[in-house]
Amino acid sequence: MMPAHGGDIGTAATAALYWGTRVRPVRFGRRRGHHEEARPVALEQTLQRIAAGKVVAIFRGDFGGMETDIVAAMADAGLTAVEVTLTSPDAIAAIERVAKAFGSRLAVGAGTVMTTAEVERCAAAGATFIVSPNRDVAVIAHSKKLGLGSFPGCFTPSEIVEAVNAGADAAKLFPASALGPGFVKAIRGPLPHVKIMPTGGVTPEVARAYLDAGAWGVGAGSELVNKDVMAPGGLDRLRERTAAYLAAVRGQA
């Protein structure tokens, strides 16, 4: 006998199985008016962009409103992902400017996000992934509820497993300089399915070693984006520095 019809997803799924069809769950994101916006495509695109480029450039500090100029220089050099930390002055406005200008071709994220309220603000500004220095299950869950990528900070195998079990898309290994590529290689043995992104003190040479050890990508802060960009000729030097960093990471140097 065919199962009875009803209005809930469980009944719909049962009926679909009866007829040999398949129901895909709908994931929801930011509210627009009285509706929810489905964002699985945006999330998948974000993860693909980071995986393709291997490097997330991190803004931390005051760059005098030059964020879009800085991102343009790095994008010209081949960068595919950027993170603006909430410790930067006027960070939400900066995220919004960068997302509006580059969201169609770069993954634009927010860093140092430590509360669910901050997740909401970053999502509204256009961020498509959330990075934290710590592992907070509530922040992970809220990021996923809004259809955003979630990269919480982890330092131990237990924290990595707990983060992934809570729904994290990747574990930000932080501070990576205290652990090194050997840690990534060791952790990939029992946890080959986990995406690991070392961040903190990641020079081009060390970045290549992390990737060779099995890292999914790396986060680069002052190694790429620093106060030199505000000096005369700084954007040209940033473009060259970014190109050299990416070449080293991709084994082309």
Predicted regions, residues:
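Extreme N-terminal basic, low-complexity initiation segments
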Residues: 1-9
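Conserved N-terminal beta1-alpha1 strand-loop-helix module at the mouth
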Residues: 35-125, 145, 193, 204-205, ...
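Hydrophobic faces of well-ordered beta-strands that scaffold small-molecule active sites
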Residues: 55-59, 82-84, 108-111, 130-131, ...
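Glycine-enriched alpha-helix->loop->beta-strand junction motifs that scaffold or abut catalytic
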Residues: 75-80, 102-105, 124-130, 145-151, ...
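Helix-adjacent hinge/juxtasegments
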Residues: 109, 115-157
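Catalytic cores of alpha/beta
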Residues: 115-125, 159-166, 203-218
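Glycine-rich phosphate-binding active-site loops on the catalytic face of alpha/beta enzymes
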Residues: 134-139, 173-180, 215-234
